[in-house]
Design a protein with these regions (language model features):
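C-terminal output/interaction extensions
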Residues: 122, 130-138
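Conserved binding/recognition cores within well-folded domains
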Residues: 2-119
Length: 138
């Protein structure tokens, strides 16, 4: 006979084991690899995720690390939508990292991050503006 039930039980068990605190369904840590060492980074310390030629996370303290993920969609699924917002194709930002949001004439918004990430200016379509404002104003 087929052994599917037991393998699905195993995966359930594994899920429970790898996430003992099932109350939080969002990812609490990301692992970065630095010089062949692994380092756990708390999700709340991440200012933004960026998809460039390589993928990076910028921390609130200004550090930047390469991180393994295929798409930002896949990262978005793991994050608390109250905490993180998908600004555009390239960035997901932490509400705690936002310094200012400035509408510019060619129908977009420029999001400036707090020190020490102030060099990061993130463009967002003006179409997202009402939703984004509502997201920030809580």
């Amino acid at each position: 006979g087929k052994k599917n039930p037991s393998s699905s039980n195993l995966s359930e068990l594994l899920k429970a084991f790898t996430n003992p605190n099932s109350a939080s369904k969002f990812k609490e840590k990301f692992i970065v690899n630095i010089r062949n060492q692994w380092m756990p980074i708390s999700t709340k310390d991440i200012a933004c995720f960026s998809k460039e030629v390589l993928n990076y996370i910028y921390l609130l303290n200004g550090e930047r690390y390469m991180i393994d993920f295929v798409t930002l969609e896949e990262v978005e699924e793991l994050l608390d939508p109250k905490q993180f917002y998908r600004a555009n194709r390239q960035y997901i930002i932490n509400i705690e990292a936002i310094q200012t949001v400035k509408p510019v004439e060619n129908s977009k918004l420029i999001i400036k991050l707090k020190e020490p990430n102030q060099k990061l200016e993130i463009d967002m379509s003006r179409l997202k503006s009402p939703e984004f404002k509502k997201w920030m104003d809580r």
